[in-house]
Amino acid sequence: MKLLEERIIKDGNVLGENILKVDSFLTHQVDYHLMRDIGKVFAESYADAGITKVVTIEASGIAPAVYVAEALKVPMIFAKKHKNITMTEGILTAEVYSFTKQVTSTVSIASKFLSKDDKVLIIDDFLANGQAAKGLIEIIQQAGASVEGVGIVIEKSFQDGRQLLENMGVKVTSLARIKNFENGRLNFMEADA
């Protein structure tokens, strides 16, 4: 997605050798115009998949996921990273390691929101090592639902997340694919949409 790549170049900051900070439009402050465009692109990419639910993980995946769900006209569910006292029964869980935060969390979704008839599109802000998406896939499979694809706003293609997900038989669609970081700059490779 050319518009997204241009925005990353304009407003993204490379930190070290493998961190991209995009807090001015995605991970802290949200540009809803850009998110709406992102939602439309993912909806077009999965228009024929019969998606019934969009699933993400809190927190930075929520903004793009809401706009994808809006464009597909389906509900959006986000996995919670912290146990809520109101979630007392029928909980689907998985362990997820965060590359950015360097911590493992138990994420959960109430089972009443997913059924064996659901066709799910997972949406997330970043793909690095694939652990967040893998955890969401585990939760969706616990419900007996099917994963139709994983939509990623920004993929760090130099890390092994895509390979992990494709080895699991999951279609990955990334709107911006970063080939590498070089001298504080980033290089893109061809995106999926």
Curated annotation (Swiss-Prot):
Record-linked CDD domains: PRTases_typeI
Pathway(s) this gene product operates in, as recorded in its UniProt entry: Purine metabolism; XMP biosynthesis via salvage pathway; XMP from xanthine: step 1/1
Chief place of localization: cytoplasm
UniProt-listed Enzyme Commission number(s): 2.4.2.22
Cellular compartments per GO CC: cytoplasm
Signal peptide residue numbers: none
Catalytically driven reaction(s): XMP + diphosphate = xanthine + 5-phospho-alpha-D-ribose 1-diphosphate
S-S bridge residues: none
InterPro entries: PRibTrfase_dom, PRTase-like, Pur/Pyrimidine_PRTase, Xanthine_PRibTrfase
GO molecular function annotation: xanthine phosphoribosyltransferase activity
Intracellular or extracellular location(s): Cytoplasm
Enzyme class: transferase
Chain residues that bind xanthine: 20, 27, 156
Entry keywords, A to Z: Cytoplasm, Glycosyltransferase, Purine salvage, Transferase
Chain residues that bind 5-phospho-alpha-D-ribose 1-diphosphate: 128-132
A Pfam family: Pribosyltran
GO biological processes: purine ribonucleoside salvage; xanthine metabolic process; XMP salvage
Subunit structure: Homodimer.
Function, as annotated: Converts the preformed base xanthine, a product of nucleic acid breakdown, to xanthosine 5'-monophosphate (XMP), so it can be reused for RNA or DNA synthesis.
HAMAP family hit by this protein: XPRTase (MF_01184)
Family of this protein: Belongs to the purine/pyrimidine phosphoribosyltransferase family. Xpt subfamily.
NCBIfam families (UniProt xref): PRK09219.1 (NF006671), XPRTase (TIGR01744)
Protein known as: Xanthine phosphoribosyltransferase
